[in-house]
Amino acid sequence: MLTLSDFDFPLPPELIAQSALPDRSASRLLVVERLAPGEQPDAIRLVDRAFSDIIGYLKPEDLLVFNDTRVIKARFFGQKPSGGKVEVLVERVLDTHTVLAQVRASKTPAEGSLLHLAEDAFAVTVGPRVDQFFTLRFPAPALDLIEQYGRLPLPPYITHDPDAYDETRYQTVYARNPGAVAAPTAGLHFDDALFARLDAAGVRRAFLTLHVGAGTFQPVRTENIAEHKMHSEWYAISPELADAVRETRKRGGRVIAVGTTSLRALESAAKPDGTLEAGNGDTDIFITPGYQFRLVDALITNFHLPKSTLLMLVSALAGVEAIRAAYRHAVEARYRFFSYGDAMLLTRQ
C-alpha cells in the first residue's frame, strides 16, 4: 500500500519559480512519452521541449479542455472592533452578498460581530461557522468589493507581495468566470498566438468551470493517504462541452485535460461508460494510484508539491514510477516548479 512518504521528493528551493516568464508559451515542457509495449510495458521516454512545441503532440481529432475560472482578489487585512488584527481569505462566493472565508485572528470572532477590512473601507458581518470556514456578509455585492479592495492571493510558496504584473500573469488569457482563489496554472502557458496555431492545426478546445479553492494547497497530514479528507470545489459542465466530448470520441480523438482542475471536474462528471454529463455541483474527488479513469486520456500540468494530492493524481494517471523518473529528471534538468513554473504532458498508463 502506498503511503504519504512514497510521494516525497527532494526539491532545491531555488527551483520554485517566484515569478512568471514574460512570454507565456516560452516555458519548458517535459513530455513523458509512453513507449510501445515490449519487454518493459511501462517504459517511458522523457523529452525536453519548449511549451510552444506542444502542438507537435496534438492531433486534429483531439479536444483540449480548459478551466475558465478567474482568480478573485480574495485576501483582505483588517481589524476587529477591539482593534485586533485580522486576515480574511475568501474561499467561496455563496451568493451576491455572502462568502465562505478563512479568518485568522488572535481570538475567534463572534457570530454577529463586524470585521473592518481594507483600511476600514467597509465592514463584513460574521455569520455561522461551516467546518473551518466562516460565513461573512458583505454590505454590497461581494464580487464588486473583492475586486475593488482585495489583494490577489498568491500561493504560500511565492514570497513576494502581489503586484500589477501578477494580476495579469496569475490569470489565464481566457479567464472569464470569477470565483477561484488559485489559478488553474497549466493554462497560464497558453497565449493568443499559440491558440491561433492550434486553430490552424485543427485542434479543438472547450471550456468548463471549476472554482479552485485554497484547499488545493492543503497538506496531507496522514501517512495513510486514504484517511485524508479532500477539500470540496464547485464546478460546472456545459452541454456544449458534453457534446464536444461525444464528438471527440466519435472521431477517435483524445480528451486532454489542461490542468488537474479540468481533470477533476471531468472525472467527477463522467459516467461509468465514459460519457460526460452536463450540470454543476461540488466535487471532493480524491484521485490516487489505482483509480480507474473514465474519461481523460492525457493531461497538461505543472510540477506539483511533494506529498501533495496533485502529485498523487498525476501518479494515478501516468504511473508512480513514471512520475518519480520524470520528477528526478526535472530536478536534474533545472525545470521551474509549481504555479509559475514549467509544464508536463502526460498520457494515461
UniProtKB/Swiss-Prot annotation:
Keyword field: Cytoplasm, Queuosine biosynthesis, S-adenosyl-L-methionine, Transferase
Q: Does the keyword Metal-binding apply?
A: no
Q: Where does the UniProt annotation locate this protein?
A: Cytoplasm
Identify the EC number(s). Answer: 2.4.99.17
Which spans are transmembrane here?
A: none
What this protein catalyses is: 7-aminomethyl-7-carbaguanosine(34) in tRNA + S-adenosyl-L-methionine = epoxyqueuosine(34) in tRNA + adenine + L-methionine + 2 H(+)
* Pathway entry: tRNA modification; tRNA-queuosine biosynthesis
> From what superkingdom does this record's organism come?
Bacteria
Any one GO BP annotation for this protein: tRNA wobble guanine modification
Which InterPro entries does the entry mention? QueA (IPR003699), QueA_dom1 (IPR042118), QueA_dom2 (IPR042119), QueA_sf (IPR036100)
Q: Which Pfam families match?
A: Queuosine_synth
Q: Which GO terms describe its cellular component?
A: cytoplasm
**Xref: Gene3D superfamilies:** QueA-like
Provide the primary localization.
cytoplasm
Q: Does the keyword Heme apply?
A: no
Q: In the record, what terms sit under GO molecular function?
A: S-adenosylmethionine:tRNA ribosyltransferase-isomerase activity
Description of how the protein assembles with itself and partners = Monomer.
What is the recorded function of this protein according to its Swiss-Prot or TrEMBL entry?
Answer: Transfers and isomerizes the ribose moiety from AdoMet to the 7-aminomethyl group of 7-deazaguanine (preQ1-tRNA) to give epoxyqueuosine (oQ-tRNA).
Return the similarity comment: Belongs to the QueA family.
Name the record gives this protein:
S-adenosylmethionine:tRNA ribosyltransferase-isomerase
Protein source organism: Cupriavidus pinatubonensis (strain JMP 134 / LMG 1197)
